[in-house]
């Protein structure tokens, strides 16, 4: 089972279409989130929102690297 899981993560990590789709999905999700949050009344914490987004992105990439899905 462990070998099968390792083969699956290697095939996903080296897959061009999976990389493209995940990039498009994350880009669209961030854009929609930014538009929604920035348009809220009395919202003035732009740098906090950017920090949180950067932190979540970095932590997600680190987790994916540990699992073996992302290679960098």
Swiss-Prot record:
Main location: membrane
Positions in the Cytoplasmic compartment: 1-12, 70-72
Membrane topology term: Multi-pass membrane protein
GO CC annotations on file: membrane
Annotated compartments: Membrane
Keyword Transmembrane part of the UniProt annotation: yes
Cell membrane among keywords: no
Transmembrane segments annotated in the record for this chain: 13-32, 47-69
Annotated keywords: Membrane, Transmembrane, Transmembrane helix
Chain ranges on the Lumenal side, renumbered to this chain: 33-46
Note: Present with 98 molecules/cell in log phase SD medium.
Family: Belongs to the TPT transporter family. SLC35D subfamily.
Name of protein: Uncharacterized protein YER039C-A
Organism: Saccharomyces cerevisiae (strain ATCC 204508 / S288c)
């Amino acid at each position: 089972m462990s070998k099968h899981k390792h083969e699956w993560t290697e095939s996903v990590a080296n897959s061009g279409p999976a990389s493209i789709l995940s990039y498009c999905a994350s880009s669209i999700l961030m854009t929609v989130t930014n538009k929604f949050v920035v348009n809220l009344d009395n919202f003035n914490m732009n740098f906090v929102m950017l920090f949180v987004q950067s932190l979540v992105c970095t932590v997600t990439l680190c987790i994916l690297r540990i699992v073996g899905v992302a290679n960098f």
